[in-house]
Every structure is written in C-alpha cells, then in structure tokens.
C-alpha cells in the first residue's frame, strides 16, 4: 500500500539542480525564439519591467534565512500553510533566478516577494528598464547583450502592466542589494520550479480566476511574481512555448 505522506513528500522534492551552462542558455534562447509574446495595451495602466535574472549558485549556500514570518503574517495566504514559515532557505543550487524580499519600509507591497524591477521611464524599453532596475536594486550592472528575450505582459490588480525580461547574468555575479528597496536577496535554483507539486491553484470567493501558488522554500509565491515564474518554467525550461498565464489571479493581499 502506498504511503500518502511519502507520496506528498516525494512530490514536493525538487529534481536535481540544472547546470548553469551554455547549453541551458541556448535552450532558453531557442524556446523564447519560438514563443509568440503577447503584449498588452497600457490603456491607462502604468508600465513596469522585471528581470528574471539567471545566475549560478552552490547547493547549501543558503542554509539559513533570518527573515521568518509570524503565524499571523502567514494567515493571509489563501491556502493551508501548515509547515510553512515564510523563510527562503535550502533552495540554492545550479542555475538560479534572483528573488527579492521587498523592504519592510516601502509604501506598497512591503516585505512581499518580487523579482528585480520597477517602472519603465520615459524613452526606455522594457529591457533597458529591467537592466537599470537590476543595477539599482541588487547591484548587478549588465550590458544589453545579457538579455535573452521577453515573456508575456501581465496585468496586475494594482494598475500595472508588467513585462518580464529574461536576463543571463553570468557565472560570477555578486549580488549587492540596495537596503532602501530590498530587505534580502536569494538565489533560487530553477529546478525548484520543476517540482511535481508546482504550480498549484486555489480558489477565492472574490474572483472566478484561479489563484496561482509556486511552492518555494518555506513559502508560497503568488502572482504577479508567481505567474511570471510559472510561464518562465513552461516556456523557457519545458519548451511549452504556447502556454499563457494572464488569467492567473493574485491573492487579495496583493491587490492594493
């Protein structure tokens, strides 16, 4: 007889880390080249760009995370959070993306998970804005040639259209987070996105759209960041270039 607890543990166990290699880079470039990106009209929305910043990392280099959420803070998540504490530890290894915990002192979305990024300035392209924000937020300055491509725009409840830009930073990059904007920065192995239990979906009474959740470390990453990471997995890692995430809902706590 199968042990349900064993099956659940197996489904949450990520595959082995992926090598940060030219082979992976070229595979991502090829998949993005076959992806027909969907851009959304602004129609009064503010335009922002984020970087899915791909770096290398060592297994075990993130053995602890001092920023633990309280049970009250975790209670706003529309899901069973048993065993979760909001920490991002034990997720590094191989090809990774950079995930930020926003500063607690910010006026909006304080302490929430985010990718490096921000508003697109007048005259900037999404790629230029993503590179600028990467420099400003995590101290990584990269040339335009580091950009591999873009994924679909995502419209947020707070009035933004977000353009995700996939960026290859190189194997020796040093992260230097700006404390005014970023409380902590993490290298999360992209293999964590390939877990059998990821992504997962829940329903909420406030919307008929499914709320997407990406299990990472001791937390669940929600849209918009979660939606962008899901499309990155499907398109760039799995090669499922026609998959879309525009209909994935955000949790109510992220609507403001």
Show where each model-derived region lies.
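NUDIX/MutT-family hydrolases
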Residues: 177-216
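N-terminal leader/linker segments that precede catalytic domains of diphosphate-processing enzymes
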Residues: 1-114, 119-136, 140-173, 215-256
